[in-house]
A protein has these predicted regions:
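AAA+ P-loop NTPase catalytic core and its hallmark functional loops
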Residues: 1-188
């Protein structure tokens, strides 16, 4: 897939130029290239694409809501591809806790070390973190994300480092309303 699908939909050329500049400003290391998705299905919807691209270019995160099978994950994957960013997909369910997101202690070579979670890896590498079904997350899991998602842009891991988000890092949450196991998200 290439960027022609955006031009075929008449997505704003100025937005596409801004995306090109973003990609030049934040080049990827070779080892991160493998994490950039190549979506098998292009997302079609000019208005939604333009709003999403503009939001991400402004340094904001996205929350995509809608019914089941409406293309939220396809859009998220396409946005990672468009921006040329590594994608970190985190599916929320009852067993996802804060340690699964930011990291947990592990024993390596006779010492305790941090095994980094997906959110930490995303933050360090300037990735696009896709929070799939974020409204199924437990409160303690979501609470560790607040400092990363607000103006602070940090992840503070007790006993380890304080990680500042790479300037290209963005988070995209997806949610379905009204399904079993889902709940309202708080304003934070």
């Amino acid at each position: 897939m290439n960027m022609d699908f955006l031009r075929q939909q008449h997505v704003s050329e100025s937005l596409l130029k801004d995306v090109e500049n973003f990609r030049k400003q934040y080049p990827l290391t070779e080892d991160m290239q493998v994490r950039v998705p190549n979506p098998p299905i292009p997302f079609y919807g000019k208005d939604i694409l333009e709003m999403s691209i503009a939001t991400l270019l402004k340094g904001e995160n996205l929350l995509l809501s809608g019914g089941k099978a409406t293309g939220k994950n396809i859009l998220a994957e396409n946005l990672s591809y468009i921006f040329g960013r590594p994608s970190y997909n985190i599916s929320f369910h009852v067993n996802v806790d804060s340690a699964a997101l930011v990291g947990t202690d592990t024993f390596i070579d006779n010492e305790v070390r941090l095994r980094k979670g997906m959110v930490t890896l995303c933050a360090e590498n300037g990735g696009f973190g896709v929070f799939d079904e974020i409204n199924m997350a437990k409160n303690d899991a979501v609470s560790v994300l607040h400092a990363a998602l607000d103006y602070r842009g940090i992840i503070d891991i007790p006993g380890y480092d304080r990680i500042e988000l790479h300037p290209a890092t963005r988070f995209i949450g997806t949610l379905n309303y009204g399904y079993a196991g889902t709940k309202e998200l708080n304003e934070a």
